[in-house]
Regions:
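Conserved beta-loop-alpha segment that forms the PLP phosphate-binding cup at the N-terminus of a helix
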Residues: 1-20, 32
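PLP-dependent aminotransferase-class I/II
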Residues: 26-76
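PLP-dependent enzyme catalytic core of the Aspartate aminotransferase-like
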Residues: 65, 263, 267-317
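Active-site PLP attachment segment
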Residues: 123-175
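Structural signature of PLP-dependent enzymes
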Residues: 179-229
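Conserved PLP-binding catalytic core of the aspartate aminotransferase-like
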Residues: 218-228, 232-272
Length: 317
């Protein structure tokens, strides 16, 4: 467990044999945690190879073709954070990494608790998986994890004293740097774990309410579908704003609307009491399971109001 995915990802990167395997393969659809860190490592001379995230249908195949014996790690999301598109075929990447002795890191942040995620069904038994509870798990800040595959013997350079906790009571001087068993080899040092107790309480609430990943997926698909249908019924010119195209079963936990005026849509909705966010030219509408259909439809009505207001301003300019 960790406070954020960055501290966990960097510990993993520090364990890789980058001096003899300097290649890192990734996509341009990764969240800034990975994107920024890899950009900086590239400045230091590592061979960071980046491919287009879309079309997502072919992303796994395109990443796989780039894996070779110089590849230390492939870093890819299971759901694209900008568009909510589910990336298929991660097992193909996993097999390629296994053949070449490379590591696979899957960012599942936008997958968890909104789309069922089965490590074994996805063929990711030997993959590292990172994610957190800030979004769909609704755990608040400070709840992230790194799933470590069984039998891992990596020795991270960035390592804290929690990783040798079991060795501390022994007498005498330490002989070299020892690591704990299993995932503890990636442990850090002292931090405030209060957030984990909050997370445990939230998960207990989910269990009490019967909010399983499968049920949450059904709720999410209904809500996102409702938003999509309501937006498309507005009949806004697609050159101005349109739903990011993908099949409904490939869309995860939010509706992405592409518009050159994403910033203005965001602020216009916010002044009307609708909280969204935007990434570049994409407005993201992410419904929580406790919102009613009427509230969601009202948000689209207010989006229409924002659109009409912007159009009026443009005519008067």
């Amino acid at each position: 467990l960790g406070q954020n995915t960055h501290e966990l990802v960097t510990r993993l990167l520090s364990a890789l044999p980058l001096s003899v395997r300097p290649r890192l393969v990734t996509s341009d659809g990764e969240f800034h945690t990975i994107r920024r860190q890899l950009d900086r490592l590239q400045e230091e001379g590592l061979d960071v190879v980046t491919v287009a995230a879309r079309p997502a249908e072919t992303l796994a195949d395109r990443l796989t073709r780039l894996v070779d014996d110089k590849t230390a790690c492939v870093l890819v999301s299971s759901v694209l954070y900008e568009t909510a598109e589910i990336v298929p075929g991660l097992d193909i990447i996993a097999r390629a990494c296994s053949r070449h002795g490379a590591t696979l890191l899957v960012d599942a942040y936008h997958h968890l608790n909104v789309v069922p995620f089965d490590v074994h069904a996805c063929g990711l038994e030997q993959a590292f998986i990172t994610g957190g509870g800030y979004k769909y798990c609704q755990l608040g800040e400070g709840n992230c994890f790194l799933r470590v595959p069984p039998g891992c013997r990596l020795r991270p350079v960035l390592t804290g004293w929690f990783s040798e906790f079991s060795a501390l009571p022994r007498e005498g001087r330490f002989r070299g740097v020892e690591y704990g068993a299993g995932a503890t080899r990636f442990a850090g040092a002292t931090y405030d774990p209060t957030s984990h107790y909050r997370a445990a309480a939230v998960f207990s609430f989910h269990i009490d309410q019967g909010l399983t990943p499968e049920r949450l997926r059904r709720i999410s698909r209904h809500q996102v579908g409702l938003l999509k249908d309501a937006f498309e019924a507005l009949d806004i010119d697609a050159a101005v704003a349109r739903v990011e195209p993908m099949s409904d079963d490939r869309r995860a936990g939010f509706l992405a609307i592409r518009t050159d005026r994403a910033n203005e849509y965001f602020h216009g909705l916010r002044t009307r009491g609708v909280l969204t966010d935007f990434r570049g030219s994409l407005v993201r509408l992410g419904p929580a399971p406790y919102l009613s259909d009427d509230q969601l439809l009202e948000s689209i009505r207010l989006l229409r109001d924002v659109h009409d207001s912007l159009r009026t301003q443009a005519r008067l300019a």
